[in-house]
Amino acid sequence: MTNTQVTLVQIDNYGPWTVTPEPRREVDLQTLQSRLYADLSQLIGNRMGYVFFTRFDNMVAVTNGLDADAHALIQESVGNRYPVTVSLSIGVDSSPAAALGTATDQLQDAGSAQDKGRTEILRGDPIQPSERTDTDVQIAHFDVNDATGKYTDQLNEFDSFINIEQGYAELMRYMRHENDSLSFFVGGDNIIAVCDGIDEAAYLDAIEHVNETVGVELKVGVGLDRTAQAAGMAAKHALETCREENTDVEFAR
């Protein structure tokens, strides 16, 4: 059974900060957000986790293996590098969606995202080392079948983007509501999903649903391990097996 540790990352009082003392240039805000994501990706990635940008002012990380001290150090590093601070909330559950729900509730209980007095909150209890297993995290790595041939080499970039995003949006909704899983677009034609130990039939159903609904064909490699990065690398290798053997779903062997 999976046991996913999810950390919600939220920039403190970000909306008001972007317009104080007057509205800040959008290009500067986009630069800050992208740099913060890059730094968090490295800070969490160096500890075998994954972070997904979602809306940039709110990000979702899979942090199995990171304890409370590691979270506090990440907070401190952000505070030292940026004119903004971040709050972190940790949830744990076999269901990634439920884990994120717990993390969200804890942070909302601490105050509004736009409360200037609510800064650098750190809440939640990470998984104890004695409770960790080699099957805690299931990562599924989806990509679009022949995205280059169907879209990149045939359509203008915006129309290609629309097709890829339609596939992502439909998969994201389906996986959330049918499988309690969290799916994230990670660039190109790639989607990474954090899943609740679902089986091959469930992945096939998801792929069929997306194809029937928006006409985007997908394949997926699935990995299972004790950290997000280890499971993610296993999923990438399984996806290569899909390409080599022309299959829709492969689990890491």
Curated annotation (Swiss-Prot):
Single GO MF annotation: GTP cyclohydrolase IIa activity
Gene3D superfamilies named in the record: 3.30.70.270, Nucleotide cyclase
EC number per UniProt: 3.5.4.29
Top EC class, one word: hydrolase
Stored InterPro entries: GTP_CycHdrlase_3, Nucleotide_cyclase, Rev_trsase/Diguanyl_cyclase
Transmembrane segments: none
Keywords recorded for this protein, A-Z: GTP-binding, Hydrolase, Nucleotide-binding
BP terms from Gene Ontology: biosynthetic process
Catalysed transformations (reactions): GTP + 3 H2O = 2-amino-5-formylamino-6-(5-phospho-D-ribosylamino)pyrimidin-4(3H)-one + 2 phosphate + 2 H(+)
Keyword GTP-binding set for record: yes
Known role: Catalyzes the formation of 2-amino-5-formylamino-6-ribofuranosylamino-4(3H)-pyrimidinone ribonucleotide monophosphate and inorganic phosphate from GTP. Also has an independent pyrophosphate phosphohydrolase activity.
Protein name, per record: GTP cyclohydrolase III
Lineage, uppermost ranks: Archaea, Methanobacteriati, Methanobacteriota, Stenosarchaea group, Halobacteria
Gene, per the UniProt record: gch3
